[in-house]
Amino acid sequence: LRRQRQMCIRDRYKNREVVKSVSLSMEKGEVVGLLGPNGAGKTTTFYMITGIVRPNHGRVMYNGEEITTLPMYKRARLGLGYLPQEASVFRNLTVEENIVSVLEMRGVKKKERIATMQNLIEEFKLSHVAKSLGYALSGGERRRVEIARTISTNPDFILLDEPFAGVDPIAVEDIQNIIMQLKERGLGILITDHNVRETLRITERAYIMAEGTILIAGTGQQIANDETARRVYLGDNFKLD
């Protein structure tokens, strides 16, 4: 299996070590969670994997190749997709145009652009809003468009930053199902989100971060039962089911 790995990376911001020593890995065909309280270093870790931030120490490896110094766009070309928490749809373009625009930027020929767009519209159940402008979409519809655009670039791995934020409970379940479909397609998916239960329910394993380090790693149930995870992050009354 191809693997994307981040090994013992560190990052310092304004003389404060935000990420102290983090080692994690992800393989194709699995869903992995990266969770923790505010200020734990999750976002910075995400940024170092995607290339937004360069670590002060350590390496980022992709399929056996070091990519620590590669810019974000080159990592994307290798197959590393990233979906930020902030809304990224083009508000004044239709759903169809949103998807086609990404394909245009990659130099895909027109006939192939149209075919790919139509397939993604159908796969992500966006036919009813295909002609709608980005600003008119609900939170769940917007997320589906953003994921469809990310998939259009044929990544091997996707990093999802707060995919459940700003969507209603029904849409959360919808996005969970989409993530499982992506897994079935063989993609590796790394998720960070404050919706702990929703994340742990769809991950094979997860990492809990606190104060810039990995506190615990394991399955959702192992983490839910861990005393340290409960004390630092989950709370004594946390239950996965």
Where do the language-model regions lie?
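Conserved ABC ATPase "signature" region
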Residues: K111-V129, Q176-M180
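Conserved ABC ATPase signature
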Residues: L133-L137, E141
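Single conserved hydrophobic/aromatic residue that forms the stacking wall/gate
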Residues: L1-R5, I9
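The feature captures the beta-strand-to-loop junction immediately N-terminal to the Walker
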Residues: L35-P37
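Catalytic Walker B motif of ABC-type/P-loop ATPase nucleotide-binding domains
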Residues: I158-E162
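Conserved ABC transporter NBD signature motif
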Residues: G58-E65, L78, T116
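Helix-to-loop junction immediately C-terminal to a conserved catalytic motif
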Residues: T50
